[in-house]
Regions:
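Glycine-rich beta-strand-turn "strand-cap" elements at beta-sheet edges
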Residues: 2-4, 42-51, 76-97
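Short, well-ordered beta-strand segments in beta-rich or mixed alpha/beta enzyme
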Residues: 4-11, 40-69
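Generic helix-packing signal
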Residues: 10-12, 31-32, 72, 92
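Short histidine/acidic/glycine/proline-rich micro-motifs that form metal-
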Residues: 11-14, 97
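Short amphipathic alpha-helical segments
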Residues: 16-40, 73-80
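Localized chelating/binding microdomains
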Residues: 25, 55, 87
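Generic serine detector
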Residues: 28, 61, 87-89
Length: 97
């Protein structure tokens, strides 16, 4: 199987998006620097949705994503991000190259 590209939509606690983004940016840099299978981590903010953040991530394989999801860096990120997150959903996609 090829690269895995999850696309996530996150609703932050009302009024907390900027704080969420501050933490998310710092953690995303660490993911890319320390997780060999993490290839891309893009953060997007939709127009006219003040408390929404979207993510586009690319991992070398489903196993690389699982290593990220269950890894220490993700657990540390959740410590900062979970109190600011109201909900999250994601779609796992195969990257077509």
């Amino acid at each position: 199987m090829g690269k895995l590209a999850p696309v996530a939509t996150i609703k932050t606690v009302p009024g907390k998006r900027e704080e969420y983004l501050k933490h998310l940016k710092a953690h995303s840099k660490r993911y890319l620097a320390t997780e060999p299978g993490a290839l891309k981590f893009e953060i997007m903010v939709p127009h006219d949705q003040a408390d929404t953040v979207m993510l586009y991530e690319v991992y070398a394989s489903p196993e690389a994503f699982d290593a990220h999801w269950n890894g220490l860096a993700k657990k540390e990120a959740n410590h900062d991000l979970e109190p600011l997150r109201a909900s999250a959903s994601a779609v796992r996609c195969n990257l077509v190259e």
